[in-house]
Amino acid sequence: AQSVILATGAFERPLVFANNDLPRIMLASSVSAYINRYAVTPGEKLVVCTNNDNAYKTAFDWKSLINDQVTIIDTRRAVQSQVVERAKAMRIKIIHGHGIIEAKGRTRVKSVLVAPLCMSGKEIIGEATEIYCDVVATSGGWSAAVHLSSQTGVKPVWNNEILSFQPGQAVQSQKSVGACNGSFELKECIEDGISVGASEAKRLGFESGKPKQKIDLSENKSEHPTQELFCLPHFKSLSRAPKQFVDQQLDVTAGSIELAAREGFESVEHVKRYTALGFGTDQGKLSNVNGMAILANALGKSIAETGTTMFRPAYTPTTFGAIAGREVKELFDPKRYTPMHDWHLENTVEFENVGQWKRPWYFPKAGETMEQSV
């Protein structure tokens, strides 16, 4: 291809807090997907915990569908934006300057402990209160999906304004647009895609370079900045608090990342191998940024200084069937032969598959069964 445009989107980040692996603790976007795609809610009482404006949309979706109990826990103080005003108009309870420090329950979440936080959100400054709920929606911001651009040789660069890695300088004829380039608003994504697509079409001699039509989108744009908060504090230290899962696929906790730093594993690549952070089939799509932030904090560095690991193919797990094709028959698994294989064939052998090796099983004469031959 003369030009490739990547529009791979972004992943919503979960917030890290104690017991955050209980069933019905979900991403805010996942709760919205249940509501908007299937018209169902995963529970009756919702608590939304967020450090950004975007998660308010989940509360709006919930309220619009069942008009039931919703509480928004916003880690930011004095938030001024349209989504806050809309939430107040819908009589949604908002608790600013607080965060979930621990979830309670055995087989599923039944309540959360909520405590007031300092301006940075990294310290608790008061007593915790318990809020009963059966669904928790969390949002810690968005991470640009830089995986495919990384596989072209582009090194991800940390952008502190959007609190995400985004593609650096391209080394091939490739451009990233929309959310994977750090534009997380829907309108910005579409405008970016149209603009870059038209520009590349003109450069390659196909079109005039001007968009054929404009798309008018009315949406609640995020107005208040996302707070730089990845791991919510607890009354106890990371090593003593209930488990705060960062990579839920491989059970990597905030405490294990901090322990890795204490043990002297300062390189992000070493920490990845010490803890298995991002080693799962998702290649750290939800966990890497949170993990890098916790590591940076433990080392007293910035996320930009800590950096991130690169991403290997494939972007998503690939089935054996897609690789092998339709007519596999005996080609699915390679056959391995011993030096005496031809002699065995000359002596009417029946083979036994031992791994990939063809081993002689027994040597029947004409018409003999295995029992008769043996």
Per-region residue spans from a language model:
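Residues forming the flavin
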Residues: 1-339
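N- or domain-start disorder-to-order transition segments that initiate the globular core
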Residues: 333-374
